[in-house]
Amino acid sequence: GLYCCQPKPNGQMMCNRWCEINSRCCGRR
């Protein structure tokens, strides 16, 4: 399935494009 936020190896979170378009993710608007 699709997850809004996924952890990168460096510990930061990355946001899927679907989430960025359709929802809020990782504090982005």
UniProtKB/Swiss-Prot annotation:
Keyword set, alphabetical order: Amidation, Disulfide bond, Ion channel impairing toxin, Neurotoxin, Secreted, Toxin
GO molecular function: ion channel regulator activity; toxin activity
Residues with Cysteine amide modification: C26
GO cellular component terms attached to this protein's record: extracellular region
Protein's UniProt keywords contain Disulfide bond: yes
Disulfide bond positions: C4-C19, C5-C25, C15-C26
Predominant place of localization: secreted
Entry's localization field: Secreted
The UniProt record lists the keyword Cell membrane: no
Tissue expression profile of the protein: Expressed by the venom duct.
Domains (record comment): The cysteine framework is III (CC-C-C-CC).
Assigned protein family: Belongs to the conotoxin M superfamily.
Protein known as: Conotoxin Bu17
Species annotation: Conus bullatus (Bubble cone)
